[in-house]
Amino acid sequence: MASSPWLIFPYPQSLEAHGPPLHVSPVLNITTSHRSRRLARSIERYTAHMYAVIHPHNLNDGTLCAGCPELSEVHIHVTRPIEEQHPSSLSCYNYTLTVRARPTPAAHIQACSDFGAAYALEGLTQLVRTGRMPHDTITVVDEPDYKWRGLMLDTGRRFFPLDTVKNLLDTMAGVKLNVLHLHASDFCRFSIESKRFPNLTSSLTGIKAGHYTQDDITEMISYASDRGIRVVPEFDVPGHSGGLLPLSGPGGIQFCETGSGPSSGRGQIFNDPAGKSYQAMHALLEEMSDLFPDDVMHLGCDETSVVGPCTLDSTFQFERKLATAVAVDFGKTPEGWEEIYFDAGAATNDTIVNVWSRHEAPEVTATGRRAVESHSGNFYFTQAVPGGPDGWHMVYHDIGANVPAAQKSPAWR
């Protein structure tokens, strides 16, 4: 290639480019035979993005070339013309993008789905710089290395308004992330309206104020789906359960600490012999399962303690029952932080293990389970990076480096 390879981010599987620059018409005609409302909205969005950098008013003097070839046609072909209501773990994002100046300047996109077509349009948008492309002959072939390309947003500790979440989703789409891990409950709050237990959010005041209505969640999921992004909810139990304290009481959720209450700070759920805690959590998670269409539900299960009546065995039983309920009663795949497998041993064979602290992905995939890598030393962007700018190399750690090829297939491809 004649110029820097960083034309598209993240860098695709294959990129070939050569030839002189190619100007792009301020009026792009994007056509497709795939009758998808989602793809139509993607075309509308990316047309607006490209127009912002193509419009003559936004170009520096001398960038336009009278009589030079102009790219004015973009043709999209979707090989599997089935419109999924929402993206899932089975969704395909592969695409091929070609740009040719001859015989007539045009871009051609072949994608496996409307999600792949949107990724190609994102790549095409990134190629347009000040009204032109860096080369007139470009071929991009791309598919994700990882099925789960996620970002976690902690709304259990801090509330983020819906418009802020939408801005985040736009940014995620720009770098081809496809999972918003919505950490919806923690010490401070349960951040989603429950119609079965309305006091969960009606009691949120002061610094703990702020929650999403169920209509907000539906709108968030729809906005994310349009950008090929799944919304995977996490309801962190039995530890990190201070946000569930409004459900405490003789007939509700029981807690390990004596005197647990709104001012206790940290709450851990007790798996009481009468099953009151489990019954309340099952009812709440069932409601949330109906609200979130994704096929994965994250149960947290991290950082529990042996405290008061809460023993390691009682914690194991509680986590195992909830993981089983997610799979059997709700028809979803359970997920938990690494403690669900390495500490409590409560992970079922189908449980996705989210490694983050003391363990690595190969320890999970060696057991035949799927792993999501979220190692705090590499990926916690709210923490200061050691060594200043030089410390960012940890962010580029290859999370699959020590995973045997035979274990990568079910876990990533």
Which residues does each predicted region cover?
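Active-site neighborhood of glycoside hydrolase catalytic domains
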Residues: 261, 265-352, 356-368
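Flexible, acidic glycine-rich loops studded with aromatic residues
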Residues: 339, 346-351, 357-413
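Extracytoplasmic/secreted cell-surface and envelope-processing proteins
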Residues: 189-192, 240-243, 307-309, 344-346, ...
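Acidic, contiguous N-terminal accessory segments
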Residues: 1-149, 289, 334-343, 347-349
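Feature activates predominantly on carbohydrate-active enzymes
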Residues: 88-278, 285-296
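Active-site beta-loop-alpha junctions enriched in small/polar residues
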Residues: 156, 185-189, 236-240, 302-304, ...
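Short alpha-helical segments and helix-capping/turn motifs at coil-helix boundaries
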Residues: 49, 53-61, 165-168, 217-218, ...
